[in-house]
Amino acid sequence: MLDDRSKLLLKALVERYIAEGQPVGSRTLSRASGLELSPATIRNVMADLEDLGLIASPHTSAGRVPTAKGYRLFVDTMLTVQQEQLPTVQLMPEQPQKVIANAAHLLSSLSQFVGVVMAPRRASVFRHIEFLRLSEKRFLVIIVSPDGDVQNRVIFTEVDYSQSQLVEAANFLNANYAGLTMEQVRERLKLEVDKLRGEIAALMQAAVSVGSEAMSGSQDEVVFSGERNLLSVSDFSSNMSHLRRAFDLFEQKTQILRLLDISSRAEGVRIFIGGESQVVPFEELSVVSAPYEVDGQVVGTLGVIGPTRMSYDRMIQIVDITSKLVSNALSHRK
């Protein structure tokens, strides 16, 4: 446990480093902390903080900078989020893809870092299904979602079906299962298979199988905006290795998606500093994220990706407000 003096000095050091981006020395801290302490005493406290892994000394400077561990302690115990007057913005309830793209742009423009939004996860609900015969034992399954999205999949069957059988299967599915998820339909079919003719049941089960894959196939898409903002961040512009790693991360997307998936299970804003998540092993990056909802159900996550040296209180506000805007826009879309 840190004593009050050590906490105050660490807080002053982190805030000064975030504001100026330069290693902070003992003389600077003696003026900034408000404590009546000599530079020598402050140096001793800084040495203790360094031993604890909370700050570090760059090779090129006598000053100190916060480590990921130091940032974490600062965020968890010392950060005070003051209400800041952010620009009044609104996300119009348009098509989900447009809302997501606009939200990513809003996050990047407000933060001047990288905005990221994981697209809503769609439950594999269908509104309407049709079958079209392409050739012998080869059929097209046409599935329409509640929001009008159309998915087509080709299936191959062991038996050939007549047009009347295709209509019979489609009518049964539409009359009894429209509005359910494909998983719910699959379970219901298992229970009702004895009531159906065997070949018709097999056709419907094949359709549900490809339908489940089709309706969930666009999940876990992620939209980035403002990647070029990192070119203006000294922490990256002065280190091409860091910059390349960041852009590789955005291009591959997999690690970011895993991190956002973790965030979707949290309540409110969550902060990942450096490589502490072990999902994105990048000490120079932090992610501030929050889930968003549609009609009260969490369907995705959004956030800001930037250097560990960021104004966390401001990022928390930006992410929190944007998540509420997205939730509102998607929930009220008609």
UniProtKB/Swiss-Prot annotation:
A single GO BP: negative regulation of DNA-templated transcription
Pfam families (UniProt xref): HrcA (PF01628), HrcA_DNA-bdg (PF03444)
GO molecular function, one term: DNA binding
Assigned keywords, A-Z: Repressor, Stress response, Transcription, Transcription regulation
Disulfide bonds: none
Stated family: Belongs to the HrcA family.
Function: Negative regulator of class I heat shock genes (grpE-dnaK-dnaJ and groELS operons). Prevents heat-shock induction of these operons.
Matches recorded under NCBIfam families: hrcA
Protein name: Heat-inducible transcription repressor HrcA
Organism: Acidovorax sp. (strain JS42)
